[in-house]
């Protein structure tokens, strides 16, 4: 069976500690270990250390932590879709309907991968 390249998009990921960030971390680790290749795409957090067994693409974000508790990613970050496309994505998983969902829809148009 062909190993799949699965892109996981989420508006939060460690160093954020919440249930959704942990779920995406666990999904990516399981995919990388057992199913294929995981790629996590998430907003940038200053000082984030991405020393995982899978690649993490962080894109430009704005500090909205005092307003909403999280940073807000810029889905129009220069070169973001090109960077993701270099990973030959087979499946797109988005765990959030907002910014990550928007990026997933743009990515679907450029890769034809299902969401």
What would you call each of these model-derived segments?
Residues 6, 56, 91, 106-115:
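Active-site proximal beta-strand in glycosyltransferases
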Residues 63-94, 99-102, 106, 110:
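An amphipathic, basic-hydrophobic alpha-helix
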Residues 1-61, 85-87:
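N-terminal subdomain of nucleotide-sugar transferases
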Residues 39-44, 93-94, 114-115:
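Short beta-strand segments at enzyme active-site cores
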């Amino acid at each position: 069976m062909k190993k799949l390249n699965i892109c996981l998009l989420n508006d939060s990921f460690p160093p954020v500690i919440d249930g959704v960030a942990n779920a995406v971390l666990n999904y990516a680790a399981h995919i990388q270990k057992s199913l294929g290749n995981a790629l996590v795409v998430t907003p940038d957090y200053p000082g984030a250390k991405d020393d995982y067994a899978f690649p993490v693409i962080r894109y430009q974000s704005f500090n909205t932590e005092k307003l909403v508790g999280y940073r807000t990613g810029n889905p129009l970050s220069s070169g973001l879709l090109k960077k993701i496309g270099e990973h030959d994505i087979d499946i797109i998983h988005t765990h959030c309907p907002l910014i990550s969902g928007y990026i997933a829809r743009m990515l679907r148009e450029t890769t034809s991968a299902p969401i």
